[in-house]
């Protein structure tokens, strides 16, 4: 059996969708039955340090488009041209790892699975520009029609898919995201103390990791501090946006700097 994957995020995204894609493919590489081949279809080679996290082997290799020398041609290949390569390579099943499927794949007779991570652009369109929400919505509805099975990463996402896409719940499977093996590593007490000192961490704290932007609502976590014991603090890790200033203003206005 040959399974194809949309590998754009594998080679381009260092966090989020990229981590999900790399971890899933890496895990499958170890457990698929003998004779199963994994093909990772990417419009370009992306970043070496990300691509290198997925090791090519006898049952896994990357596939790139031929004669696509411009960004537009590579984008068009991923949107539609890839289907011809999937047919030529004899792919039996294609997994859209990040909520998209190429045009015409159902007509080509290739079975499909798609993972949908969230529908924030439909639940909260105010966080996106107008044209992006229209493009994302079109892709979402098209994907729901084309996919044989849909993977939702949470029960909440499943409800949103049913609500906005009118999808039969029997077509949706909830499969939670995996966790990278790097988080299983136990650091030495010396290393832990070094990090504790470097970042002046309190004894008890909650960690919030992710871009500090409005749709991730870290301000709500800050506001909840008064409901927790005084000795519990919050440590926020991530790339700041102007929204981070709102959280800082709330902290200062409510004398929470020590937490």
Model-derived features with residue positions:
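Carbohydrate transferase catalytic cores enriched for Leloir-type hexosyltransferases
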Residues: 1-259
